């Protein structure tokens, strides 16, 4: 007789090797063919709605690992809401306007692009954006996201754009829009103004220059005194229009080499030590206010200019005397305006090149940074140069082109965010944050800005619906309302095709007035900031339950969305807000092409599988920056194999063909009840973690549970599962417990590794199951009686087990035993233990027998002399012969 054939060994088609890179695509096809997402929406219709609003990624290029982190986190949240029984709303979106798309299109045909009309350029940009969206859609779906990507929003949708224009109209109604000539961030490479949200700071090396301006007139200083000035922008010196001195700081007049100089007293030692002016003589100390109404001569033009009192002057760097060029510095601009210096010398054009404003032939057509050397040489020629050095400091850069930006005065359109600060502050206090520090962070970002520059000098964007009469913007509500009405009638691109009169009320047009349309387009942050309107378009209101994006969005999307929401609806458009960190390489470095350390999420999916990438996300403390790389992914893959094989494959193999009825129909043993209780406790823990989006906490307790199950319960029930009669009540009860564990955990695993969960569900032999695990609703919890007593029993068992296994391990190392079931164990215990535990100790310890004594701490281990059953390999006293095989009484009956 072949004894192996009499055993009930595990059988399942759920493979040990996942082959995720291949199998995952099959499940995508399955979900699509079976319309699983549509069935899920239908199944949840009528339930309480919960909305996660998607911050739109930019429609250009392939997705990167940061995109993957973002979308996978959102998918975790959506799936956890579905588990809790909500009707979940998530509409994927794309940000489609802006410079990168315009650049990408122009690069394709650089010679012909410049000859195209505005509308032709816009059509090419529109087509390009849609092509990029198609690519990214497919890539996002590779991540196993629970969405069919059929109902999406694009910021170039007409419905979206007209909602955005309604927001603009509301800003007009509230008197928040104004035009002004003032310095804003300007990108010479992109040739457009930028908002603060589009700026990032980089550490760079720059020239720091010390120079002098000679006093021309002063009631306090001699005319031959030199004002020491420090600047890191020598190229702005030609447009110097004033010098700023802090009225309350202490300044010093000192003499060196028969020349007199003025500097901030606090910085005197630093300056003289730097130049080794050891013989400098201090002459007198005075307050900056003493130089009020003084004047000086320009460093190389024949001009006499004023010394102004400026409280923006700092005392921790430079000289405490600041050169002011109102065209290229915001503090300079406001200081000069306050002192009635209205002229703004904009000597740099939109490309960053000197124009002919200064009538300085040497500077004309010179790029601003290249002008530094020329200007320093001039200063040397007229003895105004003191010293220059290269310093490392932070300078603003365009966050898209990664190139330096400058402050440059130009006529722009602004929103008076100062007027809505009170509402913003009140509303932010009502938003839920996982971390209170982030609430403070957003509040600071919102309240530090008084205005928002919303105009961009680009073709590819939503046109600003303003008409000018004799170069003055018509900002009255009725005019703008009519203009938008005409755009709705003729289409957005009609703005670039039709005559200006089309957008003016006939009774408002006057023959003697010259009209023209605004040629700038709206800031892309105004686009994405108004994206909450998508919810209203889809009849879900205008407030989402949750916004979640990267931590850089406090100055970006979180900021613009808050401002737009207050302007349009007097409400911030989210109830809760959380942010995630950035992805770094394995060594903690920022990823970049130049370093060659970019981790491609699509390559991870092809090599390891999307479920491994998703499991990596679940294993991160995602609110901070996290590392990813080959070694980290290998660790994640090992964890995955444990879940797949030690948990899912073991269960599926042992419940194959099991006809489960109701949990009440089975008589559970003590160990069964403990496992059911532990499973219920695990479910409670996971649900609490999910409420806080603590996915790492979920994975930790799941892994701990799997290790516990596989090392104890699964080990001690193998004998029953494999060797008992198929319909033995005890065996059926064990199968019911395994089935219970599977049904309780599969929904949680579907949150994190949906392809694997679907694979397991496909191999789950229960004929009343839904077609997909995604349609499986939250299962009922089966409560076991006296759960506290079960905990105490297991706690007592654990203390016995830990002590006994130390001795057992000694015998194993000495080679005296190979299996625990060969052991006869004597354990001394000084306290009463429940009879139920006594009766189960041998089984739970997986040993042959246990003898309890009263001798505290006594532990004896010896090898049994009993005979081994050839079928179950257990050692028994009574052994029966059957067809030349030694069998225990149980195996004798089964065979």
From Swiss-Prot:
Entry-linked CDD domains: Anticodon_Ia_Ile_BEm (cd07960), IleRS_core (cd00818)
Knockout consequences: Probably essential, it was not disrupted in a global transposon mutagenesis study.
Positions contributing to ATP binding: 593
GO cellular-component term (any): cytosol
Lyase in keyword set: no
Motif ('HIGH' region): 57-67
Major site of localization recorded for this protein: cytoplasm
Cofactor note text: Binds 1 zinc ion per subunit.
HAMAP family membership: Ile_tRNA_synth_type1
Recorded family membership: Belongs to the class-I aminoacyl-tRNA synthetase family. IleS type 1 subfamily.
Record protein name field: Isoleucine--tRNA ligase
Protein source organism: Mycoplasma genitalium (strain ATCC 33530 / DSM 19775 / NCTC 10195 / G37) (Mycoplasmoides genitalium)
